[in-house]
Curated annotation (Swiss-Prot):
Coiled coil: none annotated. Pfam families: Ribosomal_S18. One of its GO terms (biological process) is translation. Part of the 30S ribosomal subunit. Forms a tight heterodimer with protein bS6. InterPro entries: Ribosomal_bS18, Ribosomal_bS18_sf. GO terms for cellular component: cytosolic small ribosomal subunit. This is Small ribosomal subunit protein bS18. The gene is rpsR. Keywords: Ribonucleoprotein, Ribosomal protein, RNA-binding, rRNA-binding. Disulfide bonds: none annotated. Signal peptide: none annotated. It comes from Blochmanniella floridana. GO terms for molecular function: small ribosomal subunit rRNA binding; structural constituent of ribosome. Belongs to the bacterial ribosomal protein bS18 family. The lineage of its organism: Bacteria, Pseudomonadati, Pseudomonadota, Gammaproteobacteria, Enterobacterales.
Length: 78
């Protein structure tokens, strides 16, 4: 039997910490859209590796952007 794992886990990193971002703003759609899947759901931090501080800011920014019609609430193809 092999002791080696079947796949190699890559270390997850926080994109906002790497960019030295102080605050996640709702007007910065390029950063926000990386954290939304195609049906307009917010990707959890356990998948993206985002720190909890930035995940809370990101969720708040996405909700504000949706309210201001900068981002859709649901997918258009439904």
């Amino acid at each position: 039997m092999s002791i080696l794992p079947r796949y190699i886990r890559h270390r997850k990193f926080c994109r906002f910490t790497a960019d030295k971002c102080i605050y996640v703003d709702y007007k910065d759609l390029s950063k926000i859209q990386h954290s939304i899947i195609e049906n307009a759901k917010i990707i959890p931090s356990r998948i993206t590796g985002t720190r909890s501080k930035y995940q809370r800011q990101l969720a708040r920014a996405i909700k504000i952007a949706r309210f201001l019609s900068l981002l859709p609430y649901i997918d258009q193809n439904r």
